[in-house]
Amino acid sequence: MSLPLPEGRKRRVWPWVVGGLTVLLTLGLLTGVSFGHYSVKRSFPQTSGVIELAGLSAPVDVLRDERGVPTLYADTMDDLLFAQGYVHAQDRFYEMDVRRHITAGRLSEMFGKDQVPTDSFLRTMGWRKVAEEELGLLDEKSLRILAAYSQGVNAYLQDRSPADISLEYSVIGLINPDYEIQPWGPADSVSWLKALAWDLRGNMSDEIYRTIMSAAVGVDRTETLYPPYPFDRNRPIVDGGNVVDGEFVQDPPGLQVTAAAYGPAAIPAAAMPALTDVLQASAGINDWLGEPAR
C-alpha cells in the first residue's frame, strides 16, 4: 500500500529530479561534443615537431605557410618524393583514395551498388588499364620517382586505422563495413593523369555560359561565379623557366623568332586581351607553345 507524498515533500523532490536530469543532459552533451571534436581532429596532419620515418636517407624539412600550404626541402630527389607522398597522404588521402577508385571504375567498392553505372562508364574509358600499360613504357628515372612517392604515401598509412587516416572512413564504415584501404602504387598516380586529361579536354560549355552571362550582367558580376585564379594570394613558386635537355632552367635562352614568322600570330595575339574577359581562365593549365619550325 502506497501513500501519496505530502504536498510540501513533492515541491522539494521535483527540483532534485529536474536538476539531476539537467546535469545528465549537460554531461551527455559535453561528452558528445568532446567525442565529435576528437573524431574530427584525430586525422588532422601533424604540422609541428619531428616525425621519425624509415625510408629517408637524410632529414627533410616541411614548412607550412599561414594557409597550411607545405613547402618541402630535401637533400635528394628520392627523399623529396617520399616526403611529398607522406605529406599528401597526411593532408588528403581520402581524396586520393576516391580518385583512384574513380580512375579504376571501382566506386561501388566504397559507396555501394548505386555506383555500378558510373563504374561501368569509367571502366569503358579504361583509364586504369592505360596507366598500367604506360608504366611499362616509362624510363628508370620516372619509375623511381613514382616508387619513392608511393613509399611515402604508404609510410603514412602504415599502422593507422581508417578513422586515424580520415574522418570520412568512419562514415564509410557505417555503410560498408567490409571496405579496406589498400596500399598506394605507381599506377594509382599515373591513372589520375588520365582523368586530368579528360577534365582538360575542353571547357566549351563553361565558355559559352560565361560569354552569355558577361553580355547579360557584365564581366565583374560574372566573375563572382567564375572567379579568376588568386595570384595575389597564391603566388607561383616558379614564375618562369623551361626544360632544356631534360633539366629545368630558370632563365632559358629565348627562341629566335623572325618578324615574318610572328606576323600571322599578330592578329589573334591582339585579340587575346578582349577574349580573356569572357573566357574562363582557371579551368587548368593545358597550353602548348611551339616554335614556327615545328
Task: Please give the residue ranges for each predicted region.
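Acidic/proline-rich low-complexity IDRs
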Residues: 2-4, 20-24, 274, 288
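N-terminal Sec-pathway targeting helices
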Residues: 7-27
